[in-house]
Amino acid sequence: MRFGLNIDHIVTLREIRKTYEPEILEALFIAKNTHKVDLITIHLREDRRHIQNEDVLKLLEISPLPINIECSINAEITDFLCSLKNKPSKVTIVPENRNEVTTEGGLDCSLKGLGEVIRAYHNKGIEVSLFIDPLKDALHFAREHQVKQVEFHTGVYANLHNALYSNANNQIHAISVLKDKSPKELKEELHNAFLQLRRMSKEAFFMGITACAGHGLNYTNVKELLKIPSLRELNIGHSVVSKAVLVGLEKAILEMAQLIKR
């Protein structure tokens, strides 16, 4: 299983104070020196709430690890990434809503202009991945547009797992719709969410598409996904950075790597 480390929220700390620390390149090399991280993931959002254009340029120039850039189909961002001298190893196209706290679901593959943006990246020799819900129609769209990799949105699975097996339902930001469900209901929905991820990962494999996954994954809920043999990559960020605040980034990375690289 490949481990993609999302370092957006290291930059969030910097941007909260509009200062120079923490330094994104220091985080990059801490990750690299663990020898456990396979790629670095960043999300270049339209509102630039964390990652900035300058961060993209620095990482692509210096990084010894592959860089996966998440972004919307915004024309300005597409033009910027297509114009780069140093290319990312892949671009993952994600949905984006400026009012969201974090990405809320998979891409709507009927989105106007999506096919054109995919072609623009392909024409520049940049691999494209699509951040999608684990649905067959989305996989067929990927295949029709010569997309060789997808990332399944694991938010539904992760939230259900957290509600059932952690203290999430007793916290200030508990998800109200899950808080009102019984343990039996949560277990059934979690089982179905896992089965759907497993089915669609297998479907992707038979379609010649590499299946990755990410969103809301943490040190508790990630373990079950290791039972899906056709899942090749996990992208994880917030939980690692959250633990890093308490134990340090190197230790946080190593603890996660120990779980997913058995």
Swiss-Prot record:
Mind telling me which Gene3D superfamilies this protein's record contains?
Aldolase class I
The protein's matches in InterPro entries, at most eight in alphabetical order, are given as:
Aldolase_TIM, PyrdxlP_synth_PdxJ, Pyridoxine-5'_phos_synth
Question: What residues correspond to the site Transition state stabilizer?
Answer: 151
Primary location class: cytoplasm
* Catalytic residues identified in the record: 43, 70, 215
A biological process (GO) annotation for this entry? pyridoxine biosynthetic process
Query: For this UniProt entry, which residues form the secretion signal?
Result: none
Q: Name one GO cellular component term.
A: cytosol
User: What name appears for this protein in its UniProt entry?
Assistant: Pyridoxine 5'-phosphate synthase
